[in-house]
Curated annotation (Swiss-Prot):
InterPro entries: KOW (IPR005824), Rib_uL2_dom2 (IPR014722), Ribosomal_uL24 (IPR003256), Ribosomal_uL24_CS (IPR005825), Ribosomal_uL24_KOW (IPR041988), Translation_prot_SH3-like_sf (IPR008991). HAMAP family: Ribosomal_uL24_B (MF_01326_B). This is Large ribosomal subunit protein uL24. GO terms for biological process: translation. The gene is rplX.
Amino acid sequence: MNRLKKGDDVIVIAGKDKGRRGVVKSFAKGGSLVLVEGINIVKKHVKPNPNRGVEGGVVEKELPVDASNVAIFNPATEKADRVGYKFVDEKKVRYFKSNGELVDL
């Protein structure tokens, strides 16, 4: 189960960008892929197409990473953390498992 939401601050825990941080922009493939700002940037060669107004050249593009390769970043501990759910005032909220602080303030 994916416990990330759009706008969460995450850290990459596996892969070529391991240790880098970013913000979740969107999800793909039912939530199994996560598009993170500034992570997994690739260079794509684009052919010019005057009909569409596209110039040719090398374009940098962000590709999604697997959700299992990112973890939510806990600013209090400055490390990756796990997320749990609990009820506060009859409202379901997320909290960091390491120190019990709420994720959604």
